[in-house]
């Protein structure tokens, strides 16, 4: 039987025994002719292409083409494991753009990550750094490869949840921009946060004091001991505002404050109501300093709250120059 994409899209070609099959069913059916799958892969329909990417009967070259947009589907495709067994150095044969996408996925084989780190290829290094499951040892290797004049790689390492404590403690010395990312990493331990405060906490922009105070590991006792909160009561309020289980009525009560760090903690909370977000916006919008890091932190806190209203978002677009 001669098969073509026009017939498939028109619904005139179906798998044997299933006259009611849709094009999507054809794309997902492992018994579909590989050449038909190759043709469906050229369609603009996103879902059809995703289904072809997950089909074990899809030709290998077509899989690699689809892997740029559908890396998870490729990794979950049963044929992928077979290809690894058949080709011991499979990773070296995968097109660069496809490999870059695969490296950022949770299910990518560990030997792929190791291969990429050993290449002299900056885009592959970045892909590995952006994978949230990259182990600490590889992150250390990436940090050593990072160039001082291009800090995107070291920033990705600084934000990584698996970055080892000793590595974080080292890279905060690179500069304030890297230290800021480390301070925002929720996995950064207190000992590193304390180092950041000691090194950068005295600058005019209060960004580091604020970031450390907002960190989930900073308890009321630590907030007082590190001079991050004005009073014990304020430290307790900040701790409550950082707890995921705190309800909207409690957050509304906490909002009756003139302490900006507590206000930011409230704005960042998922349970803060639209009314409280607007109230705090009115309170804080009058105190910004054009272009400061603290301003950007404030604005991004509002951007990331789903309850921020459209009028406020319009103001934020202008302030952040979106």
Language-model regions, residue ranges each:
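Alpha-helical scaffold segments
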Residues: 1-322
């Amino acid at each position: 039987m001669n098969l073509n994409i026009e017939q498939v899209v028109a619904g005139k070609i179906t798998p044997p025994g299933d006259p009611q099959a849709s094009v999507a069913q054809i794309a997902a059916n492992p018994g579909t002719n590989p050449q038909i799958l190759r043709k469906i892969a050229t369609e603009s329909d996103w879902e059809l292409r995703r289904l072809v990417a997950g089909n074990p009967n899809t030709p290998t070259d077509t899989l690699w083409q689809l892997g740029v947009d559908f890396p998870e589907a490729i990794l979950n495709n049963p044929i992928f494991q077979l290809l690894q067994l058949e080709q011991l150095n499979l990773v070296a044969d995968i097109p660069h753009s496809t490999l870059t996408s695969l490296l950022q996925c949770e299910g990518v084989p560990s030997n792929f990550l190791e291969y990429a780190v050993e290449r002299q290829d900056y885009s592959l290094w970045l892909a590995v750094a952006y994978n949230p499951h990259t182990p600490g040892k590889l992150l250390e290797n990436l940090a050593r490869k990072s160039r001082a004049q291009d800090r995107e790689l070291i920033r990705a390492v600084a934000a990584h949840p698996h970055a080892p404590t000793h590595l974080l403690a080292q890279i905060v010395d690179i500069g304030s921009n890297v230290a800021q990312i480390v301070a925002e990493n929720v996995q950064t331990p207190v000992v590193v946060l304390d180092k950041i405060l000691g090194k950068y906490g005295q600058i005019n922009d209060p960004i580091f004091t604020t970031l450390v105070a907002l960190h989930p590991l900073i308890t009321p006792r630590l907030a007082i001991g590190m001079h991050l909160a004005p009073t014990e009561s304020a430290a307790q309020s900040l701790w409550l505002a950082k707890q995921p289980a705190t309800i909207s009525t409690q957050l509304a009560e906490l909002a009756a404050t003139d302490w900006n760090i507590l206000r930011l903690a409230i704005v960042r909370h998922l349970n803060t109501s639209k009314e409280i977000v607007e109230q705090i916006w009115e309170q804080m919008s009058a105190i910004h300093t054009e272009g400061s890091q603290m301003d950007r932190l404030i604005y991004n806190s509002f951007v990331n709250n789903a309850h921020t209203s459209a009028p406020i978002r319009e103001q934020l677009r202008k302030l952040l120059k979106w």
